[in-house]
Amino acid sequence: VLIVGERLNTTRKSVAAMVEALDGAAVRREALRQIEAGAHYVDVNAGTFRTREPELLRWMVESAQAVESAQAEEESAPIPLCIDSPNPVAIRAALEVHRGQAMVNSITGEAERLSRLLPVIRDHRSAVVALCLDDAGLPATADEATAKGLRLVETLLAAGIPPGDIYVDPVVRPVGADPGAAVTAIETIRLLRERLPEVHFICGLSNVSFGLPARSLANRGFAAMAMAAGLDAAILDPLDAPLMSALLAAEAVLGRDRHCGRYLRAYRQGKLT
């Protein structure tokens, strides 16, 4: 499972304080913590700053990818970041300073958003999270979500985005508000995986448990079922050790971990919990 660490988001008070104070070292430390915990990308979001979002999102990217010396830059690859914003201006500003391939979170089938974001994504050769959402709004059923997802992926492919750079998001909603939300998302992944075997499938894992107690437990249950349907990436808190352990276990059970190698290595390192 490809992990996108979700913690560098200014909706969290501690992160908002880092950004307000322009504490680049703190941003860098938070990004590194997530990579060390198993994240492959680190999500960066400055959306709560609204009018200052473009400049601050750009600054967050520079801070998270900062290196201490020219030698360090040569010896280590930059932390890959997931640029999280609905604002095309902010996304472009962040991509202009990002080193390596970024991921953009997210694009939809909404005509205006698609027309403004697609050239930016294509020009910077970014990976992209593609939401099963269009001008008609959120899908009510798995079949509707599948149709929206197929149309959006076809548009991305026609624009030259490689299938391996596309991460389809079924748009997971809280089961506390809609008891069928998780089932709909899982079925959407299954249906789209059959039609689009070369693209990836991702979701914001914690969305499913919003409003519930013991959220990590609900997240773990949903993750295993979604992975069985074809989910191969997730936006989550990599410092949630029980959740990360559950993902390793699910990969082993689903035959995605050759000879259970990653699971056994994590056990020997004392990381399973």
Identify the residue ranges that each predicted region occupies.
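Active-site mouth loops of central-metabolism enzymes
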Residues: 3-29, 105-109, 135-144, 208-216
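Short, acidic/polar
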Residues: 23-34, 113, 149, 218-223
